[in-house]
């Protein structure tokens, strides 16, 4: 995890899929023992950027609450994206 909040408890990082360059995961850790993951597809077009969240219900993005072991298994297919 890279970016920490002012309270120094929340960590946030973004990862890109190795095989699909348009697939991303945002991982947030609040220090409560669980990780929260939002998965999305991002397409950069000349006129706009399109973001489609996966696992949505009624068009709202959904956070998945997972443990560290599960997260490490998922992140084997992902590479960390450096934030600007």
PLM region descriptions:
Residues 3-8, 62-84:
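Mixed-charge, Lys/Arg-enriched low-complexity segments
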């Amino acid at each position: 995890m890279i970016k920490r909040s002012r309270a120094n408890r929340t960590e946030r990082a973004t990862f890109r899929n190795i095989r699909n360059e348009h697939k991303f995961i945002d991982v947030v850790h609040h220090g409560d023992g669980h990780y929260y993951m939002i998965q999305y597809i991002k397409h950069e077009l000349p006129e706009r950027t399109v973001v489609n969240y996966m696992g949505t219900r009624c068009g709202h993005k959904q956070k998945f609450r997972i443990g560290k072991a599960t997260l490490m298994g998922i992140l084997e297919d992902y590479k960390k994206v450096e934030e600007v």
